[in-house]
Amino acid sequence: MGSLIQTPSTQTAVVTTAEGRHQVAHGRRVPSCGPRSVLVRIKAVALNATDHKMPARVKREGLTSGCDFAGEVVAVGEQANDEPRRCELPRSWAPGDRVFGVVYGSNPGQPEWGAFAEYVEADPIMLCHVPDGWDWETAASVGGSVHGSVALCLFGDGNLALDYSNLKAQADSSSADAVTNQSPKPESFTKEELRKVVLVYGGSTACGTMALQLLRLAGYTPITTCSPRNFGLVESYGAVAAFDYHSETCATEMKTYTRSSLVAALDCLGNTQSAALCYAALGRAGGRYVALEKYPDSVSATRKLVKPSWVMGPVMFGRELQLADGYSQPADLAARAFACDWYPLAERLVHQERLRAHPVTIAGPSPPVGDKWADAILCGLQELRDGSVSASKLVVPVAA
């Protein structure tokens, strides 16, 4: 095993409680670096909605939480470079590499496998190299759960299953503007162009802005919903039209825009309101709906011509998800195969400056001071729980 520095034996981490909340834990064991893993010293972490929801779904004490991180590789398992070299775009890892990625936090099968800590044992498939010029906070905000989950929703079999050969072509091109997607005006949409329109509900979320970018790169025409104050934001990330989800006529406006021909919708929220609006916006012939949350059955039963699905990003680790309340899932080898091809592709797009980060808000001291980062994570998770974060990604610096 290659190692850069001597790691401590214990660390501070943010862990789950039996009551479905979070707490700071000191003296936690620093995970070892398995033969197919890399050990990363964490520099910054990003907070996601799933981070505050997971403790209630596992109802277990002492699981390290957190998904998205950026940091420095300090050790590499002897087989850690084998699997990435079998990917479509091969990569390798070495001590000292600056990386960003995702782990399956709050994981009953791997209690120490969470990002809200000082060190994390990471799956090399789910990592990307940090581009030159990016700081740790920007890298953590991109992480891996957002672009991975969104890509699986958009392009994965059984979900929207959109064609992304155009996106791959752009990644293979050395020119930053080699392929462009000039979306037509709605009044001039042909039938084929109408089938390229995709609704992204929640376009001002981190998942939303990522979806807008990926859709444009893949040659689709994204429309979205958000508050009017965020119309400029979503348009800057690629939306060709934005609709106010507060409006009683929102679904009607989208049906008019798409001439009742919308066939694909990505729901970044997955609640009753968002699902109902997506279903109402889809055209008379139905289509596909995919959510980043388990959608309500009361909505999915309303239209038989709509094929619904929902995605949990951790399925891309190829492991069983041991969760409560209907969220448990068996190991998904197809999702794992998708991840093997997707993460190297995403890395290339990031390094080519074709994908950019969501707006970042730094939470906690910067530069970090002692263990105050852990308290900052707890405060940030409460903000997410309260719904007080809008059009921004909370990022906490962990180490200088």
Swiss-Prot record:
The gene is ucsL. InterPro entries: ADH-like_N, GroES-like_sf, NAD(P)-bd_dom_sf, PKS_ER, Trans-enoyl_RdTase-like. It comes from Acremonium sp. NADP(+) binds at residues 50-53, 204-207, 227-230, 245, 292-293, 389-390. The keyword Cell inner membrane does not apply. GO terms for molecular function: nucleotide binding; oxidoreductase activity, acting on NAD(P)H. Monomer. Gene3D superfamilies: Medium-chain alcohol dehydrogenases, catalytic domain (3.90.180.10), NAD(P)-binding Rossmann-like Domain (3.40.50.720). This is Trans-enoyl reductase ucsL. Its EC number is 1.-.-.-. Trans-enoyl reductase; part of the gene cluster that mediates the biosynthesis of UCS1025A, a member of the pyrrolizidinone family that acts as a strong telomerase inhibitor and displays potent antibacterial and antitumor properties. These compounds share a hemiaminal-containing pyrrolizidinone core fused with a gamma-lactone, giving a furopyrrolizidine that is connected to a decalin fragment. The polyketide synthase module (PKS) of the PKS-NRPS ucsA is responsible for the synthesis of the polyketide backbone via the condensation of an acetyl-CoA starter unit with 6 malonyl-CoA units. Belongs to the zinc-containing alcohol dehydrogenase family.
